[in-house]
């Protein structure tokens, strides 16, 4: 059965999610019925069609004042309703029969916010950013998505950086046993920075994004602890923004219990990328630079040429990700997993009902 979703917030992630839906072929399984965004429809359609990072969308896009239209090669089109509602409790999710709201605003993230979408008629909510501790689950697809149940109505997809580093941490921990670690995120500039010097509550972010490498706060270590409780207080992280518009590199250093060599580490990463985490983690030894990972759908790409081992127990890795495109693809994967958990519960109920009838 087709999953009906609505996108709340049509910025970098919201637009990437919609484009990834069609480029991945998942539009055969997911139907976007509405987009809620305060911007003008003309600008929404234009930025969906043309993107400075991801190029031109391969599907023709048009609009009227109430809809986005996505054209198909066979002459048919998808009509997506445009909403301009700032109060999420007033959104018509009930009338539109929305299964899951993909909240890509970056603004909402509490249980109360999720319940507001549900009160408006949505069955479930998936936040595109780290959320409060009182939500039902935080999912890093490929690592813990199988923990989803039908009872998980308010879910977070974590962040682009947790989706990048957590699967790699799992691989290393499963193979060698991690004791502790540190992470430096080297992140492309974002739209919370200034084009030229201007006011911001974070004084470092008052400075022009194109002119400096800018340290920013990060709570990545908290996200790791949420997914792996055994690593609470075992990881620390720092982050810097650099003057590129997309793609992020992550410098991961971990101490492990087992004696290891570089070849051991790379073999473990390469093998898992070809089996259990295929499509989530990739491995390369090609001499690539950041632009080469633009529009890559993987959560993480390990650069095996940069793997280092010191004193047999300290591992250093360089891991790349397209912080927009990879994350947008995981939003779709997680939404489908949430939907599948409902289908599984329905099947189990039917099976129990048949057994009860047979035994009566």
Swiss-Prot record:
Pathway the protein contributes to: Cofactor biosynthesis; pyridoxine 5'-phosphate biosynthesis; pyridoxine 5'-phosphate from D-erythrose 4-phosphate: step 1/5
Organism superkingdom: Bacteria
Active site: 160
Enzyme Commission code(s) on record: 1.2.1.72
One term of GO molecular function: NAD binding
Localization, UniProt: Cytoplasm
Subunit note: Homotetramer.
Database matches in HAMAP family: E4P_dehydrog
Functional description taken from the UniProt entry: Catalyzes the NAD-dependent conversion of D-erythrose 4-phosphate to 4-phosphoerythronate.
Protein name as catalogued: D-erythrose-4-phosphate dehydrogenase
Native species: Photobacterium profundum (strain SS9)
Encoding gene per record: epd
